[in-house]
């Protein structure tokens, strides 16, 4: 079973810097586990690692899709597993870094995405089809997001067939279409590091990051996505919040505040996901940076162990 180091946590908590430090120390290469960093030209709003920050460490699953293309958890699962294999075969340590919980969970476990088998229900499908015809695909997808956010986050809102199937499964079973019937098997000997910090401090860091993004040109990236509003990438935080401003319906100041608010809410959801669904070793390096040697020691001990039982 291949060893994989995984670094998770909310936005603006220092995952990138830690991943570079550990890659240098343990001969690692990095796989991005972020659903938005796959898109070319969306660098600022996705907080993509810069060439300078990489310090020569190879990074994968970044800049591998055009903004007009879709990208799903199933895509990440397939491509991520291939990269783990390639990195391991080079004698290096695969390091997964990111904040998209479903992506990382589907990669580490034998998670059969979208495979829950139930009988078709034409009546339910017809009801939702009529709803979509009247209200639109976006409204249908938002309905799924309310009922089953796990599935909604893995399906593009314009894929009406998949959205309806997910709603159908949830209505008939009470479970997400992504919920396996049995506990999925673990595919890797992984060590999961979680980064967190005081909530007030985290929110302050998020606000500062958004201000810095604005200085670096976030508005231009958002304008690019405003011209492609139906693209999956346009739904990312930091882009769609500016659409009312571009339409003349809202001030720039209010749009920026909305980005900050949505980013804070997303960070809260990220923390909830990882705490509830994945058993991580949690560290607060923002407030306790001197804990880094202790963290590195634990990783070194894990690497020396034989395959985990």
From Swiss-Prot:
- Keyword field: ATP-binding, Magnesium, Nucleotide-binding, Transferase, tRNA processing
Which residues are listed for ATP binding in this entry?
Answer: 9-16
Is Chloroplast set as a keyword in this record?
no
Q: Where is this region: Interaction with substrate tRNA?
A: 34-37
* Example of a GO MF term: tRNA dimethylallyltransferase activity
Top-level EC class as recorded in UniProt: transferase
Q: Where is this site: Interaction with substrate tRNA?
A: 100, 125
Q: Which terms under GO biological process does the entry name?
A: tRNA modification
Reaction(s) catalysed by this chain's protein: adenosine(37) in tRNA + dimethylallyl diphosphate = N(6)-dimethylallyladenosine(37) in tRNA + diphosphate
Annotated InterPro entries: Dimethylallyltransferase, IPT, P-loop_NTPase
Q: Does the keyword tRNA processing apply?
A: yes
Describe its function: Catalyzes the transfer of a dimethylallyl group onto the adenine at position 37 in tRNAs that read codons beginning with uridine, leading to the formation of N6-(dimethylallyl)adenosine (i(6)A).
What the entry lists under PANTHER family is as follows: TRNA DIMETHYLALLYLTRANSFERASE
Protein name according to UniProt: tRNA dimethylallyltransferase
Which gene is transcribed and translated to give this protein?
miaA
């Amino acid at each position: 079973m291949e060893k994989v180091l995984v670094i998770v946590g909310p936005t603006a908590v220092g995952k990138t810097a830690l991943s570079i430090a550990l890659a240098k120390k343990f001969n690692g290469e990095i796989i991005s586990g972020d659903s938005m960093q796959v898109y070319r030209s969306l660098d600022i709003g996705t907080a993509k690692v810069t060439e300078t920050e990489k310090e020569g460490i190879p990074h994968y699953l970044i800049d591998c899709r055009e903004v007009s293309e879709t990208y799903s958890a199933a895509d990440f699962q397939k491509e991520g597993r291939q990269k783990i294999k390639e990195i391991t075969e080079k004698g290096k340590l695969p390091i997964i870094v990111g904040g998209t919980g479903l992506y990382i969970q589907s990669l580490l476990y034998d998670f059969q995405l979208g495979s829950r088998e139930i009988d078709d229900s034409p009546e339910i499908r017809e009801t939702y089809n009529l709803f979509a015809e009247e209200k639109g695909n976006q409204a249908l997808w938002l309905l799924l997001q309310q009922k089953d956010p796990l599935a909604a986050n893995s399906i593009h809102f314009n894929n009406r067939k998949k959205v309806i199937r997910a709603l159908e499964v949830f209505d008939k079973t009470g479970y997400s279409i992504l919920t396996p019937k049995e506990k999925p098997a673990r595919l890797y000997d992984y060590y999961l590091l979680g980064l967190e910090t005081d909530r007030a401090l985290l929110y302050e860091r998020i606000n500062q990051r958004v201000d810095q993004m604005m200085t670096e040109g976030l508005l231009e990236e958002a304008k690019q996505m405003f011209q492609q509003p139906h693209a999956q990438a346009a739904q990312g935080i930091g882009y769609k919040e500016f659409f009312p401003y571009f339409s003349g319906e809202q001030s720039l100041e209010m749009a920026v505040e909305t980005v900050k608010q949505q980013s804070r809410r997303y960070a809260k959801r990220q923390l909830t996901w990882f705490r509830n669904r994945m058993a991580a070793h949690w560290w607060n390096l923002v407030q306790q940076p001197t804990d880094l040697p202790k963290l590195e020691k634990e990783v070194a001990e894990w690497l020396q162990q034989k395959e985990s039982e």
